[in-house]
């Protein structure tokens, strides 16, 4: 196994890349504009932060993949559950950080679910049809984005800035294995000072059994899924300098689920809904830019465990969460060399729940809330020759329960020449305890403090006409991580976690038609926590649950002609550990290699046919102990554009 890993590292070092296409586009960094790194528009080569852009073109070459599966191919990211049955929990682990330590943004605004233990957002509620591009910014980003941004942020951008015609249509439909159908349509246009976008997407599948039939009885039923997403956005340019945008999104899905590890259940389902709405104002004149954002988000999750043969007990669980987010920030440039940014935000979250059992009656989780207010500021400096860039910033946060905390960011970078650049960062991050962790009747702890981290990283990047590569080393330290105490049965600040790692990515285009892309991630962790076998003493683990030490992705893309494109990709995931059960040793999950393929043919500007296949070898593997991962899956589809 060590020889295989060394071979993969060697290959990654020479022709590595992010498995999609920023990557494949070969666009120079001084032509890529990003906003997530510093909350202001800037060229990617002027920030020292580690940022990856997944473009609209890349997303369109993703076939029938989900958002979680696309993120799972990026360097340094593991989305555990992305390769399980539709509707299963998808947990984002960036650079090995625990669940809920990677902040999901929607057009720059935090997305949280206060009704969950870790407040992490359900990726099942997004579809690729909703997205124009994705910006991934790694490292502690709490200075600009607040709680949960310990490992980084993933900014899902839905705003299309390049709309000129009054009416445009894009639609895709596909059909595949397990009776899977995907349909989506987007209507958008610009009329006078108004710009509008409306999207609808639907995913339906018969699926496969979520739980693994370890006894081989072959009597586990398939667990189906049906989801819908509809969203709309309207922007009005009141003047040359001032615009306002309103948005509304409703996402819902119903998924059959099983009783647990190795355990089937025929009348058990989850019904998940989110309503997301808000508005933003933007004033931009000369060197001044002022942005105001407001977002209201309501999540409702309903679990229904119906009567089953031999189990005449009926139970339901309901969890409801509401968040309100307000933000106002402004940036000002001085002679294009110095940018000052100052802002503040207010976050209010509340949750309630109810449990009903035909055997035990009903109980309710009372409506409980928390709020936090922050002020933040940063300074960006660019030297006269644009070689040296420097960002420094800080945030002060006041939480209604635990009080005050602060963060900082120091981020220099240096462009040696047009090919080489160096960058580094020292930054702190934090995660506020969730409402559940504070107020739950049995496990809540009202004395919990914010989990704090310090992140160090340094890297080098190279690019020429045919090859580009980036290598990053990082180290993250947490001394008061939030964990569950198996002695007192309450949450407490206890975990000590140190994670060092290496990320390597590159793209190589030996000839015009061929692009080779690959990435490699290495984790070297130490986590001191309670012993999961005894639940009594303290132990230091040299691994992280469900997070492999080595991950390697590679993609070969061939543009055979202007109209025909084909790609083959592979993914290697090293062995990792998962929970073995209550007071049992952790279990080791085997490594695996998956082979995928994609092809598309454009009949003309308006019509494109595509086919994609995942796990071509039908490899049997597990992402989560006791749950099935996807078998061989294939989809064929057609895309229509009128624009």
Task: Please report, for each region that a protein language model flagged, where it lies by residue.
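Short acidic/polar hinge/loop motifs at secondary-structure boundaries
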Residues: 110-138
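N-terminal periplasmic "start-of-domain" segments of outer-membrane beta-barrel proteins
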Residues: 31-62, 91
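Gram-negative outer-membrane beta-barrel transporters
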Residues: 383-388, 475, 494-580, 605, ...
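Outer-membrane beta-barrel signature, preferentially recognizing the C-terminal barrel domain
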Residues: 263-284, 319, 421, 425-479, ...
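Extracytoplasmic beta-strand/coil segments of soluble accessory domains associated
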Residues: 68, 72-110
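Periplasmic-side early beta-strands and strand-to-turn transitions of outer-membrane beta-barrels
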Residues: 155, 163-164, 189-270
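N-terminal periplasmic accessory domains that precede
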Residues: 67-70, 90-93, 105, 121-126, ...
């Amino acid at each position: 196994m060590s020889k295989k890993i060394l071979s993969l590292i060697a290959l990654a070092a020479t022709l590595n890349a992010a498995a999609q296409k920023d990557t494949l586009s070969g666009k120079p960094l001084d032509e890529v504009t990003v906003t997530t790194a510093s909350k202001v528009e800037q060229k990617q080569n002027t920030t020292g932060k580690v940022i990856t852009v997944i473009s609209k073109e890349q997303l369109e070459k993703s076939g029938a993949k989900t958002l979680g599966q696309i993120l799972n191919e990026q360097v340094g990211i593991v989305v555990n559950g992305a390769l399980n049955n539709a509707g299963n929990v998808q947990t984002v682990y960036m650079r090995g950080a625990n669940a809920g330590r990677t902040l999901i943004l929607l057009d720059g605004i935090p997305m949280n679910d206060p009704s969950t233990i870790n407040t992490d957002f359900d990726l099942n509620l997004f579809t690729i049809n909703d997205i124009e591009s994705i910006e991934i910014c790694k490292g502690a980003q709490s200075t600009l984005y607040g709680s949960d941004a310990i490992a980084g942020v993933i900014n899902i951008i839905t705003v299309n800035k390049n709309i000129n015609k009054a009416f445009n249509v894009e639609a895709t439909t596909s059909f595949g294995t397990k009776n899977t159908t995907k349909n989506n349509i987007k209507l958008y246009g610009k009329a006078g000072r108004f710009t509008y976008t409306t999207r609808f997407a639907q995913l339906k599948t018969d699926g496969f059994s979520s739980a693994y039939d370890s006894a081989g009885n072959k009597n586990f039923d398939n667990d189906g899924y049906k989801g819908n997403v509809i969203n709309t956005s309207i922007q009005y340019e009141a003047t040359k300098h001032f615009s306002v945008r309103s948005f509304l999104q409703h996402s819902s899905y119903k998924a059959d689920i099983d009783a647990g590890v190795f355990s089937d259940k025929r009348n058990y389902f989850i019904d998940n809904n989110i309503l997301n709405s808000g508005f933003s104002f933007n004033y931009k004149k000369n060197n001044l830019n002022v942005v105001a954002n407001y977002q209201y988000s309501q999540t409702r999750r309903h679990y229904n465990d119906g009567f089953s043969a031999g189990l005449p007990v009926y139970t339901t669980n309901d969890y409801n969460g509401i968040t309100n987010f307000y933000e106002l920030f402004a940036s000002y440039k001085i002679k294009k060399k110095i940018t000052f940014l100052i802002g503040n935000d207010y976050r209010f979250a509340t949750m309630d729940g109810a449990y009903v059992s035909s055997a035990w009656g009903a109980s309710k989780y009372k409506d409980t809330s928390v709020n936090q207010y922050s002020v933040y500021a940063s300074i960006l400096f660019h030297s006269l020759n644009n070689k040296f860039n420097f960002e420094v910033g800080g945030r002060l946060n006041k939480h209604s329960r635990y009080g005050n905390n602060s963060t900082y960011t120091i981020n220099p970078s240096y462009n040696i020449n047009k090919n080489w650049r160096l960058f580094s960062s020292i930054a702190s991050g934090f995660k506020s305890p969730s409402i559940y962790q504070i107020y739950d009747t049995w496990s809540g702890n009202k004395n919990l403090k914010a989990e704090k981290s310090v992140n160090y990283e340094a890297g080098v990047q190279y690019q020429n006409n045919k090859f580009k590569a980036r290598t990053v080393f990082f180290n993250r330290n947490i001394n008061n991580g939030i964990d569950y105490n198996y002695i007192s049965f309450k949450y407490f600040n206890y975990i000590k976690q140190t994670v060092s790692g290496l990320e390597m990515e590159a793209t190589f285009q030996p000839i015009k038609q061929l692009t080779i892309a690959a990435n490699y991630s290495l984790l070297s962790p130490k986590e001191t926590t309670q012993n999961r076998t005894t639940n009594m003493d303290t132990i230091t683990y040299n691994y992280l649950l469900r997070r492999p030490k080595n991950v390697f992705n590679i993609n070969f893309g061939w543009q055979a002609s202007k109209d025909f494109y084909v790609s083959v990709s592979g993914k290697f995931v090293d062995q990792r550990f998962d929970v073995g059960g209550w007071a049992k040793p952790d279990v080791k999950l085997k490594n695996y290699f998956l082979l995928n393929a994609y092809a598309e043919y454009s009949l003309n500007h308006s019509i494109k046919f595509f086919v994609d296949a995942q796990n071509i070898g039908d490899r049997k593997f597990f992402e989560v102990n006791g749950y099935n991962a996807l078998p061989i899956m294939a989809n064929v589809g057609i895309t229509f554009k009128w624009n």
